[in-house]
């Protein structure tokens, strides 16, 4: 099957569908309707049908979707059968929390290396992950063929570290810093600003009540 170009909004929903389908499969359920799926993942059924339509005929009218077939399909789409090693750059409080988390609910993503300037933790194993000094970052990323990095360094050094990641060939950055880093067009950045998300939540609660967006 040729690579399918889909809207970014649809792409963001695919992991949500996958996780719920995996729950259904583990519980022994054989089929699911778009209405049932919509109620579970809080996405309206019309949107689900439109999302699925980008990939062709995934279900049957009057029958719904075969859970295992759909799960197998999204497993391939999301590369769930391939292990992706990622690196963590910045092992402060948030970095430590992410090392402890280490995508335990995912079968295909794993933090395999971490980097920091703190000599008290470099050269040690934290939550099962080796922590290297920043001076070893480029060498280790190349050696371990890591192309995706989680960035949790202080904001003042975020762009400098990003530039080094670009030089070594990193293709994707999950950016937890408040700085909107600058990268070439061929590099994908996902920004996760916890402070901004909390302030947005407080604003909506104060002005619109508790209705979900």
Curated annotation (Swiss-Prot):
Cell compartment(s), UniProt: Cytoplasm
GO biological process, one term: negative regulation of DNA-templated transcription
UniProt GO cellular component terms: cytoplasm
Binding, NAD(+): 90-95
GO molecular function ontology, one term from the record: DNA binding
Superkingdom per UniProt: Bacteria
Transcription regulation as UniProt keyword: yes
UniProt-listed Pfam families: CoA_binding, Put_DNA-bind_N
Cysteines joined through disulfide linkages: none
Keyword DNA-binding: yes
Entry function: Modulates transcription in response to changes in cellular NADH/NAD(+) redox state.
Matches recorded under PANTHER family: REDOX-SENSING TRANSCRIPTIONAL REPRESSOR REX, REDOX-SENSING TRANSCRIPTIONAL REPRESSOR REX 1
Family statement: Belongs to the transcriptional regulatory Rex family.
Entries under NCBIfam families matching the protein: PRK05472.1-3, PRK05472.1-5, PRK05472.2-3, PRK05472.2-4, PRK05472.2-5
UniProt protein name: Redox-sensing transcriptional repressor Rex
Gene: rex
